[in-house]
Design a protein with these regions (language model features):
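Conserved nucleotide-binding/hydrolysis modules and their immediate coupling elements
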Residues: 1-79
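Short, hydrophobic/aliphatic alpha-helical segments
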Residues: 9-26, 78-91, 184-200, 349-366, ...
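A generic structural motif
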Residues: 18-20, 53-68, 125-130, 343-345, ...
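Active/ligand-binding-proximal structured segments within catalytic/core domains
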Residues: 25-41, 75-128, 373
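Functional cores that coordinate and move charged inorganic groups
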Residues: 89, 109-227
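Conserved bacterial/organellar gene-expression machines centered on ribosome-associated P-loop NTPases
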Residues: 136, 229-353, 374-379
């Protein structure tokens, strides 16, 4: 049911929110790991639905802009109103929740895995599986997860019926082949995927589900990780799983085109490229070492009362490495400048570089600091770099 008529039985304000209760509702409240329905109530947006004090509360946006005008709350207790749910949102929840049921049932059947936690997030769903019923299994491998994924989709492809049954007493419900023991004694709802005699899954649940397993569409597992003695399964179901598959396939196609590779040899091409990258990094490392050593020797051989040189290509870390090579051989001061960032790196075995920066950089809007043998000053303009170095050189004469 997507639409209905209901009577307002209560309107209250709490924490700045307007909460409405009805004599009957088609809105599913948040619960059991599933998010609530959203939709319309008397023309107003329903943004949250929850159960409390044996009633269902609908949070509505009662101040909204309609046709360019701001309309205030016109809802009154006793009003007969139209209510409707956002069916796309409901069906999305149904697909995901039922997909989780089927997959949990397969984990239990194959490996004795008990679902101890379920979260339906915006980007993915998770279940926490505890291996309890079959002692021969002590971990969930990726191959095991792939088998569960396949078996889950096989159930979906069979388009088995999803049967919901209600029981007043625990004793009546316990006659079914339940995956998990019941947690309550009365007013029990059981959801079975497949025949009651031999279901793919059968468990107590208050959530929403499609009429058949085929409506789930598909299930895809993305990741398995250990978590607090259990195994957390990241997965998606329904249209979301399909759309995520499309997105990932698009990325895969882009990579194939960039690497001029087909799917079957994509990994080989990628690994070959990684080897080239590794080789290039190794060559660059040795080239930089040679350049740094050569620069350090040049500075040592041309040391005057002050030495200054600007670098456009070398990084700040490279320039710092040059400074390390100079340690113990600078009886004056060396200014090595990283031009792209207007950063002056000072090195000296005689003068206190940190003190020089602290006392003089701010004169030209610079900032920085450092130790006695090395320091840095950063400026906003190149002209301040030159003026700063001239000032220090004159100060040290």
């Amino acid at each position: 049911m997507k639409e209905a008529t209901a009577k307002i039985t209560g309107i209250s304000e709490k924490d700045g929110k307007t909460l409405v209760t009805l004599d009957q509702t088609i809105f599913f409240p948040t619960g059991g790991g599933q998010s609530c329905d959203v939709g319309k109530l008397g023309g107003y947006d329903v943004v949250d639905v929850f159960e409390a004090d044996d009633d269902i509360f609908h949070e509505v946006c009662t101040t909204q802009v309609l046709d360019g005008d701001r309309e205030q709350n016109s809802l009154q207790i006793g009003d007969e109103i139209e209510i409707s749910i956002d069916w796309a949102h409901r069906f999305d929840n149904m697909q995901r929740h039922c997909g989780e049921h089927i997959m949990s049932g397969i984990f239990f059947e194959l490996y004795g895995g008990v679902n101890r936690g379920f979260h339906m997030g915006e980007d993915y769903m998770t279940i926490d599986i505890s291996l309890e019923e079959k002692p021969e299994f002590n971990k969930i491998t990726w191959e095991m997860a792939k088998e569960v994924e396949l078996r889950t989709n096989m159930v979906i492809w069979q388009n088995l019926p999803v049967i919901t049954r209600h029981f007043d007493k625990r004793e009546e419900a316990e006659n079914l082949p339940l995956r998990k023991a019941l947690a309550f004694d009365e007013d029990i709802t059981i959801v079975c995927v497949g025949s009651v005699d031999n279901p793919a899954d059968c468990v107590a649940c208050c959530g929403t589900h499609p009429a058949t397993a085929g409506q789930v569409g598909m299930v895809k597992i993305y990741k398995v990780e250990s978590n607090k003695g259990m195994f957390r399964i990241y997965f998606e179901a329904g249209e979301r799983a399909f759309r995520q598959y499309q997105e990932r396939f698009d990325v895969l196609t882009i990579l194939e085109n960039k690497l001029s590779a087909g799917f079957s040899d994509l990994m080989d091409k990628y690994e070959a490229q990684q080897e080239k990258v590794k080789e290039s990094k190794n060559q660059l490392y040795h080239l930089k070492k040679a350049v740094i050593k050569k620069e350090a020797e040049e500075i040592k051989n041309n040391m005057r009362p002050a030495f200054a040189k600007k670098y456009d290509i070398l990084s700040i870390n490279d320039i710092l490495d040059i400074g390390k090579e100079l340690q113990g051989s600078i009886d004056t001061i060396a200014f090595l400048v990283h031009s792209p960032s207007n950063t002056v790196l000072l090195f000296s075995d005689k003068h206190d570089c940190g003190k020089l920066v602290k006392e003089n950089a701010s004169i030209y809007g610079g900032k920085g600091g450092g130790r006695k043998q090395s320091a840095r000053a950063i400026f906003t303009k190149e002209e301040y770099v030159d003026t700063f170095m001239d000032l220090i050189e004159k100060h040290l004469r």
